[in-house]
Amino acid sequence: MVGTTLKMRGDENASENFKQVQLKKLTVPSMEATTKRAALGDLQNRGISRPIAAKDAAQKDSKDLKLTDALRNAKARVDSHWKKQPLGSTNGNGNGAVPPKVNEGGVSAFLRSNSVRNRVPTKTTVEPTKVTVKSSSSENVNEPTLKREDSNLSKKSLTKLRAALAKPVMGVSGIRREPVAVSRKEAETKKELPETKKDSLEVKKDATRMPLIRGNSAVTTTTSTMPTTMSLSSKRLAGIEDIDANDKENLVLVSEYVNDIYDYLYQVELEQPIHKDHLAGQKEVSHKMRAVLIDWINEVHLQFHLAAETFQLAVAIIDRYLQVVKDTKRTYLQLVGVTALFIATKYEELFPPAIGDFVFITDDTYTARQIRQMELQIFKAIDCNLSRPLPIHFLRRYSKAAGAEDEHHTMSKYFIELASVDYEMATYRPSEIAAASLFLSLHLLNGNHRAGTGFNDRHWTPTLTFYSRYSAAHLRPITRLIAKLARDAPQAKLKAIYNKYQGSKFQKIALRTELTGALMDSIVGQSQRK
């Protein structure tokens, strides 16, 4: 590469006799051009050891030898034009790094030529940047909103709730149900044996792999993997189907440890029970007020188009709070219910309603501040624990084990919501409610609903017994109570759930003739008729 000579343009007052010595100073030697040229930013970073802030850089003493030596062989990069690369593009070195934000300062701004003074960065200092996502009201997110003209919540429902709260308190008495003790065996640690005893060790391992026997209490887990356990269980227990055999390719279904998950859920529901007659110590709140409150919450739940888990979690929060706080005032019972639903929406929903919507559904009876204060009190009462399993969690597992259709599953959900309003059903575990609801659905939809044959244990197969851990004999009393609630739903005073399941969204389950046939009457029993 031949040395490049910079051409200079003189003005009108410039001297024609330009000195040759000055032209040599503006000429770059050809030998110097062939050498590797350092980047200006890197060169000046090495030359400048400290920033100059107090003193003007143009007035800096020219006897700075380090700066002079560093800039002696520098050549202005006037033959290249730097262009800012878009985000995500690669730089000239091909490393794909994004050019960092640079700050110019110090002596370097005055030591460059005018052609590149405003282009080439000198002393590079990388500043960290934060990426923040701001939510705006113009986003295309269909969040559920509640308008006064579109609301189906009439003042009649609020009047009904207030009338129930204004009635004299009925005494609630009963015996508390003690939680069933949970016993688990600790996993035994395996000791390493010498290589000469490997064969005998493998034989002992095969001999100790026992099937997972499931009863009404918590079970003992094994150290073997689930496919091996299920294959051995299928050999020992005839008629039990491995419902997770075809789910190995679907990682969402976690078939490898799905039974371990349900072992944990069964344990948690025993650790967080709702005792029998849990409102016995309440002075101003009765079981009728609770029923009116939950019926109203179900109506709000339908209005907001919330998930099934949200309603069931709200009911669980209400019962757990009333079980602990025995001095709940009658005037604050609706506040407890709406706050429990507010917590459940934030826990279960992807787009929970705003707190202003919950203020509106109470007809401005409570403020947003009161809801937040009650939220803190509820979390303190339940020890910030929202992990109690719900009936819908077990129902999905049982429906899969039964090979149920959509109508079986929907009818079982209808029975579960009816049971949530009843005070006597609150003491049963969520797994028992789900199993009894499916047991009743199998009777009505798979059997002859016109024949009063009563219970048929053949609907509860060995596979259902294995995965639910309940026998048909254990579920009969619970199923009979649920059947009575379903049969009397059209004549009940609280009809929010009955009206809800008359819609086409729920396959009009509440209008099915199976719910009023002879089979239903035989399951309920003649002695329990009104």
Curated annotation (Swiss-Prot):
It comes from Drosophila melanogaster (Fruit fly). PANTHER family: CYCLINS. Belongs to the cyclin family. Cyclin AB subfamily. The keyword Cell cycle applies. GO terms for molecular function: cyclin-dependent protein serine/threonine kinase regulator activity. PROSITE patterns: CYCLINS (PS00292). Residues 121-144 have a biased composition (Low complexity). Residues 76-152 are annotated as: Disordered. Essential for the control of the cell cycle at the G2/M (mitosis) transition. Pfam families: Cyclin_C (PF02984), Cyclin_N (PF00134). This is G2/mitotic-specific cyclin-B.
